[in-house]
Amino acid sequence: MSNVKDPKAADEQLIQQAFDSLLNDYLHSNHRRKVERITKAFTFARHAHDGVKRLSGEPYIMHPLAVAQIVCSEMGLGSTSICSALLHDVVEDADYTVEDIKNMFGDKIAQIVDGLTKISGGIFGEQASAQAENFRKLLLTMNNDIRVILIKIADRLHNMRTLGAMLPAKQYKIAGETLYLYAPLAHRLGLFSIKTELEDLSFKYEHPEEYDFIHQQLKSTEKARNMLFEHFAAPVDPKLKALGLTYEMRARVKSAYSIWNKMQVKGVSFEDIYDIFAVRIIFESLPDVDDKNVCWDIYSAITDIYRIRPDRIRDWVSRSKANGYQALHLTVMGPDGQWVEIQIRSRRMDEIAEKGFAAHWKYKENHVEEDTELDKWLQTITEILENPDPNALDFLDTIKMNLFTTEIFVFTPKGDIKTLPQNATALDFAFALHTNIGNKCIGAKVNHRLVPLSHRLSSGDQIEILTSRSQQPQA
């Protein structure tokens, strides 16, 4: 009797295992138990892609299943998104229409699948105008349903995870496109884990030798990092327990791409980067106690033990980043004379940091009146997209500026925080306060020192604007 397994039977087993894994993750999520709906979408997609293989040799249906798994497990989305992910290639690759999807699964799923079909393929065309138009289509979908863009990012993530089956030239092009547009887009939507993986996978295919070098360096220094973490945590644990907290404290290592990027920007070696290692403290919220106050209690407990570096405090609990990120960051001198970055966040903050937009809306349901920085950014993007006939290059530059902009956080004399783009000047700050203040300003004090209005601001600066009633705006 032959021991060779029937290839078709092996494929069937592979497919069933992937679907069972998806259902298991879904049943352990917080969403309604719409298993029948998901099973129906899976059965439909499986039939539509029957007999089709990917370049890797596996059945094509494994790709929609993997995208659905990312959407469910890594983004925390529900059955509508899972079904849409399962069906996202049916209209493009099989003999079905959006109308067929609508008849089978309803308007909402059909609209999402239609949006995904319109933006299928790559963003980079041969010319800037084609590139701009493709990216415009991609971002326009945010107006109708943010889930289109989230599923598209999940689709790109799985394609990057399986990029090894493609020819090197194709790998290089897709990796470049991912690093140029998809990783910043994931970052702007708060998908930190996915953004990091997209960057690292792109780095792996664009700069394989540098990627391997950094991974070897990380591996060779792993034992020393583990010892540093144990020495650091030993005196901190009793302090946190004394606060009555349920928490976890773990070590976090900077991603390969982030390390390489910092080496390039600062012109330093691997050994010269001191923040490769960080400690993350995640606590469960206490009843009737504001999470912000708990963050500062933990801060006090740590600074009772270790010497702080004041210029490295980053307070994103008082005001979140534009992508919804909240945490309190500080840097202290560790037990072995090394600087250690610490990130303090609640479980809610951690979920928003890792799952981004999906978690943002989950927690926002009970606070509809809040108008967050993320909402403002989406509104800005919408306004840009509504420009009827943008110049292709101007459009791409504008969008990239909005995707890549790093915020700085500055203070008024009363201690109010204002968010400005990186490289903002004292004059930009004046206009951010009010148009009239911008028009009447004659100078500024930054950290109590007189500076010209062209002075570039940095995070943590305190700015006082000097005005004159007689000052008139310059034409």
Q: Where are the regions that the model predicts?
A:
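Short, contiguous pre-domain boundary segments
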Residues: 2-31
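Internal insertion modules embedded within essential enzymes
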Residues: 14-19, 98, 106-109, 115-279, ...
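Short, mixed-charge amphipathic alpha-helical segments
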Residues: 25-41, 97-109
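General structural signal for alpha-helix termini and helix-helix connectors
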Residues: 25-28, 47, 51-54, 73, ...
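Active-site flanking loop/helix segments enriched in acidic
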Residues: 29, 41-70, 120-138, 414
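Structural motif
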Residues: 31-36, 58-61, 74-77, 141-147, ...
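Short, well-structured alpha-helical segments
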Residues: 35-46, 61, 82, 110-117, ...
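Alpha-helical phosphate/pyrophosphate-handling elements in metalloenzyme active cores
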Residues: 40, 50-82, 86, 90-100
